[in-house]
Regions:
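N-terminal secretory signal peptides that target proteins for export/translocation
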Residues: 1-14
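Bacterial N-terminal signal peptides
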Residues: 18-29
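Mature extracytoplasmic/periplasmic domains
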Residues: 240-245, 260, 313, 317-346
Length: 370
């Protein structure tokens, strides 16, 4: 009888011990980080499908060291420029070769989105395969050479009949926005194709090879604004920003410059109307509302996605981020995690009618084949 009682007591003690151990393990598990991803000693390759010096390159090189500080393990983030094909070359390479271990990311621009939206034959990538962790809206400024003799948008019509040259990455790149804008204003411009990025276009402008240009806000603020004081650039207009109702407003980063709809009214004497303007606005939204983004490749594990999302969120929520980013990116709200995913879903939603109209325009105007 005593033996039986002793066995019962021993069993009870064992069960109690096991329960306590399980509770301890559970406690430790709950106390552990949500994701155990650690990139200590690793090297992240950030593909930027544009040449050095343009808006996307400037944007990526600004973000890289800041995000690195917030990624588990603080890996070095190295920007790798792969220009070509209006950014399709680098995006195709990412789609084909990127590993899903969190060490390969892609930075896209509107010039990557437009060929995708238009069904460009060079596109072998699919945004639906990727996961966005950051969406950066931006603006853009159109400017001209002082040699053209105008001082503001009010004098734009005096450029009609003059030989205007614009260095372009391609008609299906983000350059679609300025090229269509000038066409709507009845201002003829010769597009010189073959640029590897907007940075190359800006350098062509600085060398005097072309006399009109546009840059996204990041490159404009950093690379072009200093030239205004030197008398080498005349700012004409910004593209503007969209308010909550989808109406164009002046870009708060360039409040003294009229936006495109204002310039339309200056030139045509009436408010914007017609299919061409509607299509311009649709592609402006697609190219600028979520203009640049950081993407992880297909098959990336959720814990790696979470680690990157958390790192980007910490970066943009830092106390000094707004001050630092205004000098490089302008004052635009950054969308992260789920908001970034939603931003790109909206930006890549173009109606079939708008797509068909612009494809026909590109074929007629620039002999683009689809």
């Amino acid at each position: 009888m005593n033996t039986i009682e002793n066995n019962k007591r021993s069993a009870a003690k064992l069960i109690k011990s096991l329960v306590a151990s399980a509770a301890c393990i559970t406690s430790l598990t709950l106390a552990a980080p949500v994701h155990a991803v650690d990139f200590d000693g690793e090297r992240v390759e950030w593909i930027v499908p544009f040449k050095e010096g343009g808006g996307s390159d400037t944007w990526a090189r600004f973000f890289a060291p800041l995000i690195s500080e917030n990624i588990p393990g603080k890996p070095a983030i190295v920007v790798k420029n792969i220009p070509g094909g209006g950014s399709t070359k680098g995006a195709n390479q990412f789609q084909r070769n990127a590993k899903n271990n969190g060490l390969n990311i892609l930075g896209t621009s509107g010039s990557t989105q437009f060929p995708y939206l238009l069904g460009d034959t060079r596109v072998n990538y699919d945004y639906k395969d990727w996961t966005a962790v950051l969406a950066s809206p931006t603006g853009g400024v159109f400017y001209v050479s002082p040699e053209l003799g105008i001082k503001s948008a009010a004098e734009l019509t005096s450029l009609r009949g003059k030989e205007l040259k614009y260095a372009s990455q391609g008609a299906t790149s983000l350059d679609l926005v300025p090229l269509l804008a000038l066409d709507i204003l009845d201002i003829d411009v010769q597009a010189i194709f073959g640029m590897k990025g907007r940075g190359a276009g800006r350098l062509a402008f600085e060398r005097g090879e072309v006399n009109v240009d546009y840059q996204t806000s990041s490159a404009y603020l950093k690379k072009v604004v200093p030239l205004i004081g030197e008398g080498k650039v005349v700012p004409i207009m910004s593209w503007g920003v969209l308010d909550d109702d989808g109406n164009l407003q002046r870009d708060p980063n360039f409040p003294d410059l009229p936006h495109f709809a204002e310039v339309y009214e200056m030139v045509h004497g009436k408010k914007p109307e017609g299919t061409a303007f509607k299509v311009w606005k649709a592609f402006f939204a697609a190219g600028f509302a979520a203009q640049k983004g950081i993407f992880l490749p297909k098959g990336t594990p959720q814990d790696v996605i979470d680690a990157w999302g958390d790192a980007v969120e910490k970066t943009v929520q830092a106390d000094d981020f707004k001050t630092r980013s205004e000098l490089v990116l302008g004052d635009y709200p950054q969308a992260v995690k789920g908001k970034a995913v939603k931003a790109f879903k909206a930006a890549l939603d173009i109606s079939d009618a708008d797509r068909e109209w612009v494809r026909n325009w590109l074929t007629a105007r620039y002999n683009v084949k689809f």
